[in-house]
């Protein structure tokens, strides 16, 4: 058998394996239309270190303040993009170049959800490419409301703490539906690195960021908002500097 033929066979096998993998991911995404995930890749790994705190809550059982705060913190253009925020990516690249090191990420809520549900946190081109493919599947297969609901239920909010309900209970001893604007902003300020940015910790960055998030809440659109009134939107300001990778 010639080298060329072996190479073609290898490439054909690689294509088949890659296609089957994408079909598996697609099946998992389509299942999310009507079924809540039992766990996530991040929770599965965390369970090896002990019990994971997580209680599922439907979209309407989570405070609109938290939805607004999370979008302000992580993805202000969530309702407008199709999985990728090119403006956010350009802004992150600019900040990283100015700092000479990674200090900002450009991942959307959808991309973060893809990573949290199915992938690892390793920074490789292969993982980022797979994340992009799954993000497209999520955007095509699910509504914005459903994507945000899923994210709020699987996002990490501290050691072994996953989802809005577990976070609200752990930090404030209340349900996710009862979170105030300040409490919601404090939780959102911890994302996406809650083990580094704990608002009860010694750093001033999280408290400053929480204040900024709370001030910006009225500026963001959320899917299917409730009837809770918000104050008039303030003038947009720049967020405090910090590592948001």
From Swiss-Prot:
Biased composition (Pro residues): 226-239
EC number(s) from the headed UniProt entry: 2.4.99.28
Swiss-Prot/TrEMBL keywords: Cell inner membrane, Cell membrane, Cell shape, Cell wall biogenesis/degradation, Glycosyltransferase, Membrane, Peptidoglycan synthesis, Transferase, Transmembrane, Transmembrane helix
GO function terms (MF aspect): pentosyltransferase activity; peptidoglycan glycosyltransferase activity
Location(s), subcellular: Cell inner membrane
Transmembrane domains' residue ranges: 10-30
Membrane-topology annotation of the record: Single-pass membrane protein
Catalytic activity: [GlcNAc-(1->4)-Mur2Ac(oyl-L-Ala-gamma-D-Glu-L-Lys-D-Ala-D-Ala)](n)-di-trans,octa-cis-undecaprenyl diphosphate + beta-D-GlcNAc-(1->4)-Mur2Ac(oyl-L-Ala-gamma-D-Glu-L-Lys-D-Ala-D-Ala)-di-trans,octa-cis-undecaprenyl diphosphate = [GlcNAc-(1->4)-Mur2Ac(oyl-L-Ala-gamma-D-Glu-L-Lys-D-Ala-D-Ala)](n+1)-di-trans,octa-cis-undecaprenyl diphosphate + di-trans,octa-cis-undecaprenyl diphosphate + H(+)
Pfam families: Transgly
GO BP annotation list: cell wall organization; peptidoglycan biosynthetic process; regulation of cell shape
Chief place of localization: membrane
Gene Ontology cellular-component terms listed: peptidoglycan-based cell wall; plasma membrane
Family stated for the protein in its record: Belongs to the glycosyltransferase 51 family.
Function: Peptidoglycan polymerase that catalyzes glycan chain elongation from lipid-linked precursors.
Record-given protein name: Biosynthetic peptidoglycan transglycosylase
Native organism: Alcanivorax borkumensis (strain ATCC 700651 / DSM 11573 / NCIMB 13689 / SK2)
